[in-house]
UniProtKB/Swiss-Prot annotation:
SUPFAM superfamilies in alphabetical order: S-adenosyl-L-methionine-dependent methyltransferases
Top enzyme class: transferase
UniProt function note: Catalyzes the formation of N(7)-methylguanine at position 46 (m7G46) in tRNA.
Reactions it catalyzes: guanosine(46) in tRNA + S-adenosyl-L-methionine = N(7)-methylguanosine(46) in tRNA + S-adenosyl-L-homocysteine
Biochemical pathway: tRNA modification; N(7)-methylguanine-tRNA biosynthesis
Lineage of origin: Bacteria, Pseudomonadati, Campylobacterota, Epsilonproteobacteria, Campylobacterales
Protein's recorded name: tRNA (guanine-N(7)-)-methyltransferase
Length: 392
């Protein structure tokens, strides 16, 4: 991630703005300061962390913007305005950095859902985008939705789509399991998962699992198809076993079949003479219904100044685990007389991180997490823990 190291930080007087970058307020604890930053339509934190002989300034990994150019620009402006004696830097704002809003990248699920219509294919972990762009060109009347956890991949593929005049794609940074959980039932024609990380020694980290397979069955249309392509026979066999739990699925199994398009990983494996396995699955016959989304209802929580002092004094790094969700209180920061709380929460296999701003009331510092049931339960638990565990 882009960053730089400085020996000295000048006094930070906010708000401060320059060249479409705004630094609005900051919160801090003993080790870290967070600068609330806006670049055009996106908000995120810059993080200042004490280090040996200076400070490291970088983007907060849980709020980083969808376009790396936004972060690079914010770092440049902060360095010029507030830092002295730069020790080193690992970022550079290039003239061709993708800073302007692109129609190919959506920033959140609400924006995504508003743009979904017609036939939809999903590619999970599209990487360099070769297969995704190929599908888009071959199927101009289909919307190709790419989900990827790495920001640089989104930026790269958006640039390629623009250069190649491909207009039927949408890209989002997300965990694929979380994405599937917010889609309507029977709304997707195909789901591609090509060369996922096998996680041989940590199978619990695989995207494939019973819940994932159920979600695939729910969102796929009648005779919609899931397609896995992998060089790992263990992963291939594991995936087959997961889908065999359905009543009457149909499968197509293939080995070392050449497709019209080859990813860079596939090219590498073929040079090493590795076997390539394909698994297609359809005919799930799954009874499905769309989930009813509830609200977080944070308006029911109110704080006095004394309450905030008690929360700050009694704060502990604790984790609460329930049957289908967890809640982890990670860090607390002071912002004038108010507090900023960092928590991780949600389902065990699709957790989220967020910052909560506490003054007279409580609210999300950035956009709301999506309203899946595990997140709703975790936030309800948080409201109770604030009262009981932190003695307000």
């Amino acid at each position: 991630m882009p960053n730089f190291k400085s020996k000295k930080i000048k006094e930070i007087n906010l708000p401060y703005s320059k060249d479409d970058v705004e630094f609005l307020w900051f919160a801090k604890n003993d080790n870290v300061s967070l600068i609330y930053t806006k670049v055009q339509e996106e908000s995120f934190f810059l993080q200042i962390k004490k280090a040996q002989n200076g400070f490291v300034i970088k983007g907060d990994k849980h709020t980083k913007p969808s376009k790396i150019g936004y972060l690079q620009k914010a770092l440049k402006i902060f360095k010029e305005g507030f830092c002295e004696d730069i020790i080193n830097e690992a970022f550079g704002l290039k003239n061709n950095a993708l800073i302007e809003k692109t129609p190919f990248i959506v920033d959140n699920f609400d924006e995504l859902l508003s743009k979904l219509q017609g036939k939809i294919y999903i590619e999970i972990g599209f990487g360099s985008g070769r297969h995704l762009l190929y599908q888009a060109k071959e199927n101009p009347n289909v919307l190709i939705l790419g989900v990827e956890i790495y920001n640089p991949a989104l930026t790269q593929v958006a640039k390629l789509a623009k250069a190649q005049n491909v207009n039927n794609i949408l890209l989002i940074q997300s965990d694929a399991r979380l994405l599937l959980s917010v889609l309507k039932s029977k709304s997707v024609e195909k789901i591609f998962l090509h060369f996922p990380v096998p996680w041989g020694k940590k199978p619990h980290r695989r995207v494939i699992g019973k819940d994932f397979c159920k979600e695939c069955a729910r969102v796929l249309v009648q005779n919609g198809r899931f397609e896995l392509r992998t060089d790992s026979f263990e992963y291939f066999n594991f995936t087959l076993e997961q889908f065999l739990t359905f009543p009457a699925p149909k499968f197509s199994l293939r080995k070392n079949e050449n497709l019209e398009i080859s990813s860079k990983y596939e090219d590498r494996w073929k040079k090493q003479e590795k076997n390539i396995y394909d698994l297609w699955v359809w005919n799930f016959n799954q009874e499905c219904q769309n989930y009813e989304l509830n609200e977080f209802n944070l308006s029911s929580v109110e704080f006095s100044k004394e309450d905030l002092k008690k929360i700050e004094q009694n704060f502990k790094n604790i984790t609460i685990k329930k049957d289908d969700f967890f809640l982890h209180f990670e860090s607390i920061y002071k912002q004038d007389e108010n507090l900023l709380l960092k928590v991780a929460f949600g389902a065990f296999n699709k957790s989220e991180h967020c910052y909560l701003h506490l003054d007279k009331t409580i609210d999300f510092a950035f956009k709301e997490p999506f309203k899946i049931q595990e997140n709703i339960k975790a936030i309800n638990e948080l409201k109770e823990i604030l009262k009981v565990q932190f003695k307000i």
